[in-house]
Amino acid sequence: VYGGQAPFVFPANNSQDDIAALKAIAEANPLNSDLRNFISNKDYLKDRGSNDGYNVGVTWNTESTSRVKSFFIDDGRTQTVTTMDVSALSGLEQLDLQNTRLKSLDLSTLTKLRSSSLYGNDSLTWFTVKLPNSLPENFWMNGYTTIMAGTPVDGNNAYAAAGTEIDLSAYATVGGVKSVYQWYLIDRATGKRTK
């Protein structure tokens, strides 16, 4: 106690439904040690963001029964997250998924969702993400998915001979918005982009 002031810590009343949903996500991805540790160490009770050096985390809102406000996974280390049911996280406002192996994602029940970042997820495309019917005016969604075209060299690279036609017509527009493509020429010896 300093100067007549004492710190107070109020026990959180975290939503048991949200905790059960987080546990179910971990159970559905048994090969992911980050999710397993997140649950077994009860790290889900701590607010932590994606910039805090962790691969999995949540923040809770300040309602009397706290709901998960944000949830993130960066699965770049193991790439073992293959399924994700976030439908029970009804208070979710921000979702950040990176480097997973998800093939689809249903966000349709998340009516409070304000932003979603989906970077480097194996085959998750804008076609395979189901959004809520009614989105907030300033909804923010960003990210990228690498689509292999040509002959694969490894899990991240492919090549195509000059003049090879690559059909991307299926990805020309998403929800009426034209897609943007970036092409790179990589020096295979150095791995550096030349064009």
Which positions does each model-derived feature cover?
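N-terminal capping/linker segments that flank leucine-rich repeat
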Residues: 1-90, 94, 129-195
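An anion/pyrophosphate-binding glycine-rich loop and adjacent beta-alpha core
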Residues: 115
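The leucine-rich repeat
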Residues: 84-85, 105-109, 127-128
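Tandem repeat domain/solenoid detector
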Residues: 91-93, 101-104, 109-112
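Flexible, active-site-proximal loop/turn residues at the rims of small-molecule/cofactor binding pockets
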Residues: 111, 122, 133
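Canonical position 11/12 of the leucine-rich repeat
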Residues: 77-82, 100-104, 122-125
